Swiss-Prot record:
UniProt keyword Secreted present: yes
Disulphide-bridged cysteine pairs: none
Organism lineage: Eukaryota, Metazoa, Ecdysozoa, Nematoda, Chromadorea
Feature: compositional bias, Gly residues: 312-337, 526-536, 545-572, 605-634, 656-700, 727-752, 775-791, 907-923
Start and end residues of each stretch annotated as Disordered: 261-338, 368-933
Protein's name in the database: Protein qua-1
């Protein structure tokens, strides 16, 4: 007891001791720590995404465990302190611009100060500031803006607050340092300027400005000990300290370090130099004659070389370089010969001679032309221009540069190539500037003297070895530089005659503010090119010998035929010319046989014996032109006789010249090949080709063109042609190709919808004129066409099945089939009747339709004959002998549509396209019925997006949320769903039609990498909402939704009446937010489908939120918002009571087990099943 009485006073006193809590702030999603306000021993901070100097949506590159965040664009994002006295660790956000150029040129620095928060343990003692001159931190000059000190400080508060306003941030945290007496917080204000000022301002820093307050030069952790007098001293004394803390200048600004030295060119005989010289360093290409002896200045931000002007003497003349940085420009030049160069040079030196020296060139310096230098050079400044004298042929490359022109070859008569090695500092090293071989072994015979000749082997030279240097030709091109000389043309020529050119390079080099660089003019008369790609020797003089096997373009293509080649070849010619020997040559030489040439192309006149078949040649001895088919021997073959007839798949024209009938799908050797629809789809097709499905044309229309055959259907009746209300001719999608080889009575098909957009159109006895047993002939694709879309003018309820990868691109053809093949297959195979339709159609039997009629969702075969609910895809030819025979309009089978109503074929209703088993007189070519896109159930019929198995409409998938690119409104602006975090405040609807911000308490479901299908709702106001089919959405008839908006508790009622999004229909309404923030009834104008990656379902206390401007529920799986709300409230209170709520960032959140269990119970027990 005595001990307890002694301890009790100590415990009571300890309650009055100040306590210091550790710091732990975190800003996610590219947000940084922003100071909202400070003063009175308190700093208020919040997280915000930074808009810096006019640049928005900047991104963070995070560096963890940093003692502070040094750098111009480096700011604090996370703060962590393990204990109240432990050092503070930072996660720094290095901001960058994710868009092009990836910089923020208008941000030129930061003005920073230090704010100290004394520890509360000082117990009211006044904290005396350090003397001003020795203060270890800097303060701004205006005390009214930021107080320099505080009196009577007894404690501190460093707090994180939510953003209350949207004013742009001006104070950013650079670091928080724990000291013995409290915290020291470094705060910076970004300094911005205009873009034009950044680009054009070449002035230095103003006197008296604190250069070091730009944090761009911080490279060490000594930031906390920098003092103001150090800044002033550095600015005054310059030198090394100033260099250490100087402000980094933006790209484009010049410093006072001096003018950049221009580069010099080392020249020699026939040194083909492309020069772009500007002494201010704005040239993007450079080469030099000397070695740099000083460091680059800050102005030299490109790739210039500020070499000394100790120019290396090249073979007969090298050009010197400008002086080193800061010393002006000096140049030395030697005389050269045969260097055909046109150069314009702009210099901008601030001291020195600004001399320019180029070997034997046409030079324009700053607008004045005619400058020619021969070994004279100004020598000014630092190692500038030791004036290269006129070098001899074997002058060593003293202090050689990059050797871009292969100067100073060791051999007197060898041309210079493009040497690659950097020169060495050894004067005796004669191989510095490129290889001794210099790219050519001294050839002759090619370009005339004085023409441009770069040793690359890509000109039309041909020299044969051993030429003189004066003729300016290339040798065989074995140099070790990058030139590959053509030599004897034994290499592989291009085949295509290169433009010959005039041998001169014209170079335009403009002032520093001009972006035009080198322009090489190679336009000249077309040369003859090489003699093919093979080993043929043909050359530009038409002299070719020997045998070759290549084919080229230009002069002679074929092998062995140069232009007057006399070898044997087997290739094809080109350009309307013929060659000698066997095979097709070119260039106007007749061969051993006579031939005809086609239309100025594709093979010259063949001579002698052609050997190819398939593409190109006709029969054995025919000089055929190129055929276009792919079967063996299926060309036009305008040879002696008719060419071999087209085999299995002739593509454009049928068989030989005696054949007729140009069908695109020729069936072998029938005369003309069978047409596609009576006459074929090809060009004319006047033969007696077969009809599409064994009918001989009939009197109706073919698939594309008109067939002129006289074949008839079963009873050769043209039918009544009773069309739907639209398309009176009955020639297409839904109104029946009625007369297409009609069978008995030519049943007019199931009619079509015609012009109306609802499922009732096309019912006006369109098909009643046919007798009930006439199913064999007529209709063709019409009955099923009517079922699919209801005529070309019908309406498919705007249901889009969209591309799997892109997400919004409507599909057609086989792409749709690929997509649908990935979806659940819940019906039987469509080919129940008839072997003629092999595409796979829908079998909408009574069993399946009855099964789906309970929920109003028709089942759709995964592979359908419709594209976007539109025109029918033509089935494969049937096996019958007469009639068009795809499906009649007979009543042999009745089917039930999605609404439970039964339609028979005789009524011609455009709803389900019946007549699935009508047979022709001698064939079964039947087409199964196709399910239409009726207004009521088409969206579910198009894609059952969330049904994982064969459970039909009652099934449910696990992916029932919003897409990743959906937008929600937060207190700081709009966020994508994949950027939303627990703790964010989002805009939600509430009672009284009032909108408010609610906290995201948890994620009901979050799977960023899961791919699933989404329903996309497009509204009249322009909103677009993407959510899974089993997500709850308040949607109803527009009149009802209008009532919701006028009733004070309308939003609550609408949420309770939410239903699955997949049940939304065109013409119904959702609740949206207009531009003024009012809740309105917004009509759905289109229902689409898409696939995307990422599913997200955030939860708020209200159980609802606004996504993409549309009011939506947070729940899915159970079609009852109220039941979900009860479940969520239960889970929330349990989690909250036991401390299980996760307040940290969540990457992956599966559906809660309790929700899955409730979904299971809902099928049998719960009232909302």
């Amino acid at each position: 007891m005595r001990r307890l009485s002694a301890i009790l006073p100590i415990l009571l006193l300890s309650n009055f001791w100040p306590t210091v809590e550790s710091l732990n702030y975190k800003c996610h999603n590219d947000q940084i720590l922003v100071v909202q306000s400070f003063g009175n021993d308190t700093i208020r901070m919040h997280c915000q995404r930074l808009d810096l100097c006019g640049y928005q949506k900047l991104k963070c590159d995070y560096d963890e465990l940093q003692p502070q965040c040094g750098g111009k664009l480096n700011f604090v994002s996370h703060v962590n302190q393990k204990g109240s006295t432990a050092p503070v660790e930072h996660t720094c956000c290095n901001l960058f611009n994710p868009r092009s150029h990836h910089s923020i040129p208008t941000h030129i620095g930061n003005d920073c100060f230090i704010y100290e928060l004394p520890d509360g343990s000082s117990n009211g003692k006044k904290v005396d500031p350090a003397p001003a001159d020795d203060a270890p931190y800097a303060v701004l000059k205006n005390p009214a803006e930021i107080p320099e000190q505080f009196d009577g400080v007894t404690g501190y508060r460093l707090r994180l607050f939510l953003l209350k306003n949207k004013s742009p941030p001006t104070l950013l945290v650079k670091g928080i340092e724990r000291r013995l007496d409290g915290y020291r917080v470094t705060i910076c204000r970004p300094r911005c300027t205009s873009y034009d000022k950044v680009v054009n301002d070449n002035e230095g820093a103003e006197d008296g400005e604190w250069k070091a307050i730009s944090w761009s030069s911080w490279s060490s952790s000594s930031w906390s000990t920098w003092a103001r007098h150090a800044f002033n001293k550095a600015a005054a004394e310059g030198g090394e300290a100033a260099e250490r803390i100087r402000t980094r200048m933006p790209i484009g600004e010049k410093t006072v370090a001096g003018a950049a030295g221009a580069t010099g060119a080392a020249g020699s005989d026939k040194s083909n130099i492309n020069i772009h010289v500007e002494s201010n360093g704005n040239n993007n290409n450079s080469f030099e004659g000397g070695r740099s002896s000083s460091e680059k200045s800050d102005g030299q931000l490109n790739r210039e070389i500020s070499g000394s002007s100790e120019a290396g003497a090249g073979g007969k003349g090298g050009a010197g370089a400008d002086g080193a940085a800061g010393s002006g420009a000096g140049a030395g030049a030697g005389a050269g010969t045969n260097g055909n160069i046109n150069i314009t040079v702009h210099t901008d030196g601030k001291s020195g001679g600004n001399a320019v020296a180029v070997a034997n060139a046409n030079v324009t310096v700053n607008g004045a032309g005619g400058v020619s230098t021969t070994g004279t050079g100004a020598q000014t400044g630092n190692e500038s221009g030791l004036g290269g004298s006129a070098g001899t042929d074997k002058a060593g490359g003293k202090k050689g540069g990059h050797g871009d022109s292969g100067d100073s070859g060791n051999n007197k008569n060898k041309d210079n190539g493009k040497g690659k090695g950097k020169g060495k500092n050894d004067e005796e090293d004669e191989e510095d500037n490129g290889d001794e071989d210099g790219n050519g072994k001294g050839g002759n015979g090619g370009n005339p003297k004085g023409e441009w000749d770069d040793g690359d082997g890509d000109e039309d030279d041909d020299g044969t070895d051993g030429g003189s240097k004066e003729s300016g030709n290339n040798g065989k091109g074995k140099g070790k530089g990058s030139g590959d000389g053509d030599g004897n043309r034994n290499g592989n020529g291009d085949g295509n005659g290169r433009p010959k050119g005039d041998g001169n390079i014209k170079i335009n080099i403009h002032s520093p503010d001009d972006n035009d660089l080198l322009e090489k003019d190679e336009n000249g008369p077309n040369g003859k090119g090489g003699a093919g790609n093979g080993n043929g020797d043909g050359d530009k003089d038409n002299n070719g010998k020997g045998n070759g096997t290549g084919d080229g373009d230009g002069d002679g293509n074929g092998n062995g035929n140069g232009l007057t080649g006399d070898g044997n070849g087997t290739g094809d010619g080109d350009n309307n010319e013929s060659g000698n020997g066997n095979g097709d040559g070119s260039d106007k030489n007749s061969g051993a046989g006579a031939g005809t040439k086609p239309e100025n192309r594709e093979g010259g006149d063949g001579n002698g014996n052609g050997t190819g078949d398939g593409n190109g040649d006709g029969n054995d001895n025919g000089n055929g032109s190129k055929g276009l088919g792919t079967g063996s021997g299926d060309g036009k073959g305008e040879g002696n006789k008719s060419g071999t007839p087209g085999k299995s798949d002739g593509k454009e024209d049928g068989a030989g010249s005696n054949g007729s009938g140009n069908g695109k799908e020729g069936d072998g050797n029938k005369s003309g090949g069978s047409g596609k629809g009576g006459a074929g789809n090809g060009k004319s097709g006047d033969g007696s080709g077969d009809g599409k499905n064994n009918g001989n044309g009939g009197t109706g229309d073919g698939k594309d063109k008109n067939g002129k055959g006289s074949g008839s259907g079963d009873n050769d009746k043209s039918g009544t042609r009773a069309a739907g209300k639209g398309n009176a001719e009955g020639n297409g999608k839904g109104n029946g190709n009625d007369g297409k080889g009609s069978g008995s009575g030519d049943g007019s098909g199931a009619g079509g919808k015609g012009d109306k957009s609802d499922s009732e159109s096309g019912n006006e006895a369109d098909g009643k004129d046919g007798k009930k047993n006439e199913g064999a002939g007529g209709e063709a694709a019409a009955g099923s066409g009517g079922a699919n879309k209801g005529g070309s003018d019908g309406d498919d309820d705007d249901v889009d099945v969209t591309d799997v990868e892109v997400g919004t691109k409507p599909l057609t053809g086989t792409k749709l089939e690929e997509l649908l093949a990935k979806l659940p297959n819940e019906t039987a195979d469509g080919n129940a009747t008839g072997d003629g339709n092999e595409f796979g159609t829908v079998q909408t039997g009574a069993k399946h339709n009855a099964e789906s009629s309970a929920s109003g969702i028709p089942l759709v075969q995964a592979r359908s004959n419709t594209v976007n609910g539109g025109a029918p895809v033509p089935p494969a030819p049937g096996s019958g002998a007469t009639g068009s025979g795809t499906s009649g309009s007979g009543t042999s089978e009745s089917v039930t549509n999605g609404s439970g109503a039964t339609e028979s074929g005789s009524t011609g209703s455009g709803t389900t396209g019946t007549g699935t088993s009508g047979t022709g007189s001698s064939g079964t070519g039947a087409s199964a019925a196709r399910t239409s896109s009726i207004a009521g159930d088409a969206p579910q019929a198009a894609v059952l997006a969330d049904t994982p198995g064969a459970a039909g409409a009652a099934g449910g998938g696990r992916s029932n949320c919003f897409s990743a690119d959906s937008l929600v409104t937060t207190v700081t602006g709009q966020k994508r769903m994949d950027e939303l975090q627990i703790g964010d405040y989002v805009l939600v609807p509430s009672s009284g039609n009032v909108l408010k911000y609610e906290k995201v308490e948890m994620f009901y479901h979050r799977e960023p990498k899961t791919r699933t299908n989404f329903v996309v709702l497009y509204t009249k106001s322009g909103r677009k909402l993407s959510l899974t089919g089993r997500h709850l959405l308040p949607v109803a008839e527009c009149s009802q939704v209008e009532q919701y908006t006028m009733n004070p508790d309308g939003i609550d009622v609408a949420m309770r009446e939410s239903k699955y999004a997949e049940k939304a229909r065109k013409g119904e309404c959702v609740l949206s937010i207009d531009e003024s923030g009012e809740v309105i009834a917004d009509e759905i104008v289109r229902v689409g489908r898409m696939t995307n990656v990422g599913i997200y379902s955030p939860m708020t206390v209200e159980g609802s939120l606004i996504v993409d401007g549309v009011l939506s529920s947070c729940f899915s799986h159970l079609e009852s918002h109220s039941a979900h709300k009860l479940i969520f409230d239960f889970i929330y209170y349990v989690y909250n009571a036991f401390g299980l709520l996760n307040t940290n960032h969540v990457d992956l959140q599966p559906i809660p087990t309790f929700v899955s269990f409730a979904q299971y119970l809902s099928k049998t027990v719960l009232p909302f099943s």
